[in-house]
A protein has these predicted regions:
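DNA major-groove recognition helix of helix-turn-helix/homeodomain DNA-binding modules
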Residues: 72-94
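Short, intrinsically disordered or compositionally biased N-terminal tails of bacterial proteins
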Residues: 1-26
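Short, basic/aromatic recognition patches
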Residues: 90-107
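A short, Lys/Arg-rich alpha-helix, primarily the initiator
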Residues: 18-43
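Sensory/regulatory domains in signal-transduction proteins
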Residues: 106-108, 112-208
Length: 208
């Protein structure tokens, strides 16, 4: 199943794209509550709430409130949770997925669903970059997001994107960005969220 976004708000405006600063600070990454993801991580790794509380240096009741969405994490607690939940290629299956993407003829790449760090990339996508792929792998691509991508990211929560292991893919129209390093041109983009072996979430980004 795929969710399509073709309303006016998601379409590229007429005329040339406006100049924009691609600095990430001007387009803050929409950050959903991490409690539900922490709970899935605990379940997968059989970590009790009491042990998670020790890891974070908080009371067990705090872990419970995070997971229930009653209490939000502080900035330091969230940074620790992001390090814990960030996608990484650990298992043979994860690396096989990366090889499939690296060998694909389609324009696609794989990023961490939480941080947008680049995990894998197809040759046709890498050919669009003006920096060597090796210098971009492991870094966040969010700073290169187009305005449409920024809006779509903020629209994921109402879709239950972060609440389920395998939500429907989303397709939307994006305009261009102002980057020469990671250029984005007017096109249709598809995002698919998938779980890696350690329970972290990755996102397959395809240009259709």
């Amino acid at each position: 199943m795929t969710v399509l976004f073709t309303d006016f708000a998601m379409r590229r405006p007429r005329g040339p794209p406006p100049e924009r600063n691609t600095n990430m600070r001007n387009s803050p990454l929409h950050t959903p509550p991490l409690g539900p993801q922490l709970k899935r991580w605990r379940t997968l790794h059989r970590v009790k709430q009491s042990h998670a509380a020790e890891l974070f240096g908080v009371a067990q009741s705090t872990i419970s409130r995070w997971e229930a969405g009653i209490q939000q994490m502080s900035a330091d607690e969230r940074a620790m949770a992001e390090r814990l939940l960030a996608a990484r290629l650990d298992s043979a299956g994860d690396h096989a997925l990366a090889r499939l993407i690296a060998g694909s003829t389609a324009r696609m790449h794989l990023v961490c669903d939480l941080t947008h760090r680049l995990l894998a990339c197809s040759p046709s996508r890498a050919a669009e970059f003006t920096r060597p792929l090796s210098t971009l792998v492991g870094t966040s691509l969010w700073r290169y997001a187009s305005p449409e991508i920024v809006r779509m990211e903020a629209a994921l929560d109402p879709l239950g994107w972060h609440d389920r292991a395998g939500p429907p893919s989303v397709e939307f129209a994006t305009g261009a960005n102002a980057s020469r390093v990671v250029p984005i041109r007017g096109s249709t983009c598809r995002w698919t969220r998938m779980m890696l072996s350690d329970g972290s979430a990755a996102r397959l980004v395809e240009t259709l």
